């Protein structure tokens, strides 16, 4: 044990120092992009638009999977207003889709789809606490510790990204954004042909507490991308991308974080 660790061990045997250490750990994690997801302006997500402009040529094709009420769409429209683009939005909940439609400007370059993306085309049950719930999930989550009851549900339609692209004659996606509360890996599985075919440049997805309920670990994402022509990174608030060189158990951090997969050049 090094001298610094010995010093910490000696002074840490009380509640006050433990609280200081916990606060320090949270600050350090935040700087590394762990637990930062949720505030678009401060969680590293914005970096994807810089990446698109630097590495891709317009017209840009963007998939917003898990559109909710149009929060990400609003950022994308503002960022892309000086260029050519096509944005495809996916929101399976009927009431939330109505909110999305109401919040979205009339724009023939934006396609709103009242369905979700998954590993197969089917019907599924969506669970949520209230209309427009940002945490709506295809898994009934146990959120009693937050005083939240996901006691509402509805049957929704799902398709796969590969099937959607085939039907709509989409040959390339510049940005695939996934925020579907623990079912991101299912959507990735349904996009395997496009990913393996080098037809997706950038994938942005969230990992966090919802993965506790779906029992999907970071290890599962690591092994998925290990067999694809993409490199995996964690986004930080500064915009710096930390490359996930190899899997470590310490990566299993269930406070919400954003990850970016980039097509290998």
Name these PLM-found stretches:
Residues 1-265:
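Phosphate/nucleotide-binding beta-alpha loop and adjacent structural elements of enzyme active sites
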């Amino acid at each position: 044990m090094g001298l610094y660790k010995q010093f910490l061990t000696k002074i840490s045997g009380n509640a006050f120092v433990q609280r200081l250490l916990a606060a320090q750990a949270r600050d350090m994690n935040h700087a590394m992009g762990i637990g930062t997801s949720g505030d678009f302006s401060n969680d590293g997500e914005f970096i994807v638009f810089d990446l698109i402009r630097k590495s891709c040529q317009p017209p840009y094709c963007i998939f917003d999977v898990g559109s909710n009420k149009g929060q990400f769409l609003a950022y994308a429209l503002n960022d892309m207003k000086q260029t050519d683009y096509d944005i495809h939005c996916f929101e399976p909940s009927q009431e939330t889709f109505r909110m999305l439609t109401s919040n979205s400007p009339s724009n023939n370059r934006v396609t709103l789809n009242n369905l979700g993306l998954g590993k197969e085309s089917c019907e599924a049950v969506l669970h949520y606490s209230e209309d427009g719930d940002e945490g709506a999930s295809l898994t009934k989550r146990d959120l009693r510790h937050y005083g939240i009851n996901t006691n509402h549900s509805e049957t929704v339609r799902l398709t796969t990204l590969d099937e959607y692209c085939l039907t709509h004659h989409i040959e390339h996606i510049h940005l695939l954004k996934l925020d579907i509360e623990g079912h991101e890996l299912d959507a990735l599985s349904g996009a395997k042909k496009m990913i393996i075919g080098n037809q997706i440049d950038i994938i942005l997805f969230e990992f966090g507490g919802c993965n506790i309920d779906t029992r999907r670990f970071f290890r599962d994402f690591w092994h998925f991308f290990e067999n694809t022509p993409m490199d995996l990174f964690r986004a930080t608030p500064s915009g710096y991308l930390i490359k996930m060189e190899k899997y470590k158990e310490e990566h299993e951090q269930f406070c919400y974080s954003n990850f970016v997969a980039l097509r290998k050049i």
